[in-house]
Amino acid sequence: MPFGLTNPPATFQRFMNNIFSDMLDVHVIIYLDDILVYSDDPTEHKKHVREVLRCLCQNELYCKPKKCHFDKDTINYLGFILSQDSLKMDQSKVQTIQDWPEPQKVKDIQSFLSFANFYCHFISNYSDIVVPLTRLTHKGVLWNFSDAARKSFQSLKTAFTTTTPILTHWIPDKQLIVEMDTALGAILSLQFDSGEIHPVAFHSRTFTSPELNYNTHNKELLAIFKAFRVW
């Protein structure tokens, strides 16, 4: 990309989407210059890789061999550890959260939450945990890193290592289970033939001011509505 363009990332992403339009979400995922090729079997995979390399060559785009990984059944892609059976958080990112120093000002909290939010769907009741922290980022709120905020900060760091940090992939022929509660927390899970249940994703958010006035029945309906809207 030449220097001086107004929106080079968006322009390049659009270009990549155009040249790989026939492969996107079929056996290719692309984010800027990070290309992931996936297949159901090794024979098909070699064919798909050749197609990708051919497309790159035809458009005068070239890969550095030292940055390429071939024939992997587990790979680190965009902050996630992807395998045939599961989706995990990048442990180096988790360690960064574990080592994060206690916030001293609002910008520190904003930076921490911005980083942690990337993995929010791995953490059950994430929104409830961070409420004391998000309150401190609201306009007009005086800085006071109270015991509640400190507990929230430590609880979130702990949640990244003590909760279930491994998610399974959605499988079309498996039974889906959606669980929710009146606190707007929800879990999407798969039930396997063995009877075991594994989470696919977690979702949560806090109530808005008007929603806090809902009775229990309406809060439960809202939780169901939001869960099905997300998934």
Predicted regions: what they are:
Residues 182-191:
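Acidic, metal-ligating active-site segments
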Residues 17-21, 59-60, 116-119, 217-231:
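Metal-dependent nuclease catalytic cores in nucleic-acid-processing enzymes
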Residues 2, 88-89, 178-180:
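Short hydrophobic beta-strand that contains or immediately precedes a catalytic carboxylate
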Residues 1-11, 192-222, 226:
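A short, polar/acidic, helix/strand-boundary loop motif
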